[in-house]
């Protein structure tokens, strides 16, 4: 509703709403929502449910979930000590990508600590003079705007893609979650703030769509999936290792990015650094969904099936493929589609039929899953170890989905129940927070900047800090 305020023309004869007015409005809202979902007459329960939970499930995540998402994005964009995307980001915004991450991280921490408000004086105290006021203002304006700037952004820069799904589409305020006001920054909701900041860098690049970005991001994304797989209880081969097996067996064809091996099975892992489009999350139409998935998730399924088929021919060199097999496609965004069997039956039956005709079924589609990188990192970040960790988890998913009573809609639901099985109830089962927060490069850098700036301002006149805050406010409000 906050978003809609920037799209409607105020009535000159406004008045305080009565109970009857509110009742009428809510009924109209439900009526509109009913018309929107009436077209989702899919025989598939999964496809029918996707639009209904699209703008609901992410709001229910704890704040720590989106804090981890912010840290994950920093790690993806910084495979080394510097970011290969720094220059590209600076050409478009005038600031380095690394600096942007540090500045918005402080803004996120500060607004959470101050009940969604952050005074400009506080920003100056903890970010300046390490960063110039101009750099701070440019960074904040990527995720914030005055009421006028927000209205222009929503109507012109980022117009609504699907007008008839307004009640179920994700709010576009995710792209500008912060309001610039007199004296302070403000956000209507902490979860909106967390997700908006966590996804800000990638959203910027996706909107710009510069040449070669998707390929370079795909490589960085694959590198981070490799980082997540690096656990003592996960053994795996890289793409080059699988190609070597092909060569030794005298075969050629598609390979997966990773092949996790275990004593009694294997997992074909494919990294796809893609995010869903708004329209595919708001529809149950399989054709529209397939159109986007064709070059990402469906392509990943084809790679997994062909790789499993080809390794059958090399089984003398690689015995793990003779046993139980699973497939896992790790995506950047949440597609609200976690089972390969749903894609095979409800979205791309003709493509899968052709695939089966060519290769048979070397891996059951019930054993292929889709998982966002956020959930995958959450899973692999748990401190508790388990023999053949990833195999054990995917078997857990299959067992739960085999029974309608325990079947899950979201991968994170499987993860939570897996943790409860993995660790007794009298022990704490959370992600390894120490690795995610205290030992993270983004966290360390942000703390260092805040400490240096706080030490600089200690003992200085309050009037000096105030003058700087006024200058920052003017820069933020400038058109």
Give the positions of each predicted feature.
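A solvent-exposed, charged loop/short amphipathic helix patch at secondary-structure junctions
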Residues: 276-296
């Amino acid at each position: 509703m906050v978003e809609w305020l920037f799209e409607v023309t105020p009535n000159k004869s406004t008045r305080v709403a009565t109970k009857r007015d509110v009742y009428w409005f809510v009924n109209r809202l439900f009526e509109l929502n009913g018309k929107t979902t009436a077209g989702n007459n899919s025989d598939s329960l999964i496809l029918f449910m996707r639009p209904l939970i699209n703008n609901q499930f992410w709001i229910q995540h704890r704040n720590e979930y989106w804090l981890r998402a912010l840290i994950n994005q920093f790690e993806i964009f910084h495979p080394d000590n510097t970011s290969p995307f720094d220059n590209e980001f600076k050409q478009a915004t005038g600031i380095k990508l690394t600096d942007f991450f540090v500045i918005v991280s402080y803004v996120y921490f500060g607004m959470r600590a101050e009940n969604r408000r952050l005074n400009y004086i506080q920003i100056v105290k903890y970010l300046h003079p390490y960063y110039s006021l101009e750099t701070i203002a440019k960074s904040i304006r990527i995720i914030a705007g005055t009421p006028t700037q927000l209205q222009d952004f929503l109507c012109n820069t980022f117009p609504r893609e699907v007008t008839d799904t307004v009640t179920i589409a994700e709010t576009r305020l995710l792209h500008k979650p912060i309001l610039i006001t007199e004296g302070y920054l403000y956000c209507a909701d902490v979860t909106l703030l967390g997700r908006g900041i966590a996804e800000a860098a990638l959203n910027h690049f996706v909107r710009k769509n510069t040449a070669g970005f998707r390929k370079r991001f795909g490589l960085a994304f694959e590198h981070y999936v490799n980082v997540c797989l690096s656990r003592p209880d996960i053994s795996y081969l890289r793409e080059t290792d699988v190609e070597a097996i092909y060569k030794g067996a005298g075969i050629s064809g598609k390979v997966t990015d990773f092949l996790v091996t275990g004593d009694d099975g294997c997992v074909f892992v494919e990294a796809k650094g893609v995010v869903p489009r708004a329209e595919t999350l708001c529809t149950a139409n399989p054709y529209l969904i397939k159109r986007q998935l064709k070059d990402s998730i469906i392509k990943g399924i084809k790679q997994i099936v062909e790789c499993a088929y080809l390794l059958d021919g090399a089984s003398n060199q690689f015995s793990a493929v003779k046993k139980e097999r699973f497939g896992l496609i790790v995506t950047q965004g949440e597609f609200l589609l976690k089972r390969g069997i749903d894609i095979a039956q409800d979205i791309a039956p003709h493509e899968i039929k052709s695939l089966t005709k060519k290769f048979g079924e070397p891996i059951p589609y019930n054993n292929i899953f889709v998982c966002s990188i956020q959930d995958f990192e959450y899973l692999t970040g748990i401190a508790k170890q388990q023999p053949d960790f990833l195999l054990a988890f995917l078997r857990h998913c299959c067992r739960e989905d085999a029974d309608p009573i325990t079947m899950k809609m979201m991968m994170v639901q499987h993860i939570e129940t897996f943790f409860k099985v993995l660790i007794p109830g009298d022990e704490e089962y959370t992600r390894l927070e120490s690795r995610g927060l205290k030992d993270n490069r983004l966290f360390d850098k942000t703390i260092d900047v805040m400490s240096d700036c706080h030490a600089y301002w200690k003992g200085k006149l309050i009037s000096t800090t105030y003058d700087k805050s006024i200058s920052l406010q003017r820069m933020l409000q400038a058109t």
